[in-house]
Amino acid sequence: MTIALGKFTKDENDLFDIMDDWLRRDRFVFVGWSGLLLFPCAYFALGGWFTGTTFVTSWYTHGLASSYLEGCNFLTAAVSTPANSLAHSLLLLWGPEAQGDFTRWCQLGGLWTFVALHGAFALIGFMLRQFELARSVQLRPYNAIAFSGPIAVFVSVFLIYPLGQSGWFFAPSFGVAAIFRFILFFQGFHNWTLNPFHMMGVAGVLGAALLCAIHGATVENTLFEDGDGANTFRAFNPTQAEETYSMVTANRFWSQIFGVAFSNKRWLHFFMLFVPVTGLWMSALGVVGLALNLRAYDFVSQEIRAAEDPEFETFYTKNILLNEGIRAWMAAQDQPHENLIFPEEVLPRGNAL
C-alpha cells in the first residue's frame, strides 16, 4: 500500500482511510491497528519491569531486597506486588496513595500494577496483531486462537486470582525466584498439584512437548534426499515447490510402532494445536477456581486413618503435612502485619493431623 501525495479527491480524504493506509502498509515491521495497542503497552510493561528490577526496593511492601541496586541478580530481582493493606487499588501515580510522588509510588508497589495491566493489554494486542495479519493475507486465525492460551493463563494468575483474594499482594511478583515462591504458595495454600485442572495443564504442556519432538523427528527422518548433502540443511533445495518429506512413509512407520498413526496432516496439526492450548485453558480455569478458594481433591478417609493409626501413611498424607508446614511458615513470614502466631499444637508433627 502507498499514501497518495497531492490534493485528495472527495473519496480519498477520509482520515480513517489515510491512517489505515499508513498503519497497514508493507514494511519491515508491520504496525497495523493492533500495533496502536501492542507497541505502547509492551514498551511500558518492559520498561517498568527493567526499571523496577534495576532500582526499586520491596522493603516497604515485603521487607525484601529485590533490585540489582540492592545486590540481587537476574534470578532474584523482581517487581514486587503492593502491600496487602492496599487491597485492590490501581495505585495510579496521581491517585490518593502516591499523590504524584514517583518515588513514593515505586515504594508502594505502583510499578507492579503498571507492569501487570500494560502487560495484559500488550498480550491482547499481540493476539489482535495475529488476527489482523491473518486477515490481511487471507489465513485462518488459528495462531491468534492458540495465543489465547498464554493470555488466559497470564490474566487468571496475575489479575483474576488476586482479585478473588484480599489484594494484589497475593499475585506473583514479576521475577524468577518470586514466581517460584508463588508456586510454593499455591501448593501450600491450595494443594495445587492435586487439582484436576493443574493435572490437565501438565498433561497438555508435556504432551505438546512430546508431540513436538515426535513430529520434528518424524519429518527429519522422512525427508526426501533432494541433494547430495549429508546433513538436513544441504539435502534439499529451499526453493523447491513440492513437498520435502513423505507423509506415507511416516504413517507406515508409526502404524508399525503404535498400531495407529495420523492419516492426514490436518488432523495431525490440529491435534498438536489442541493439546497445549486446551491444557493452558484448563490451567487458567483452575486458577479462576482458586481465586474463589475452590478446593482440590480431598481424600479425607486417608487423613482420618493417618491421624488414628501412626503406622498408616500415604504419599497423600505426607503431602498434606508438607502443605501445613508451608502454610505455617509462609503465613507468618509473608503477612507480618497480621501478627500470626501459631501455637505448637497446630504445627505439623509426625504423621498426625
Curated annotation (Swiss-Prot):
What is one GO biological process annotated to this record?
Answer: photosynthetic electron transport in photosystem II
Q: Which CDD domains match?
A: Photosystem-II_D2
Gene name per UniProt: psbD
Record keywords = Acetylation, Chlorophyll, Chloroplast, Chromophore, Electron transport, Iron, Magnesium, Membrane, Metal-binding, Oxidoreductase, Phosphoprotein, Photosynthesis, Photosystem II, Plastid, Thylakoid, Transmembrane, Transmembrane helix, Transport
Q: What is this protein called?
A: Photosystem II D2 protein
Matching PROSITE patterns: REACTION_CENTER
Record family assignment: Belongs to the reaction center PufL/M/PsbA/D family.
- In short, the EC number is 1.10.3.9
Broad class of the protein's primary localization = plastid
Q: Kindly list the positions annotated as binding Fe cation.
A: H215, H269
Q: Quaternary structure per UniProt?
A: PSII is composed of 1 copy each of membrane proteins PsbA, PsbB, PsbC, PsbD, PsbE, PsbF, PsbH, PsbI, PsbJ, PsbK, PsbL, PsbM, PsbT, PsbX, PsbY, PsbZ, Psb30/Ycf12, at least 3 peripheral proteins of the oxygen-evolving complex and a large number of cofactors. It forms dimeric complexes.
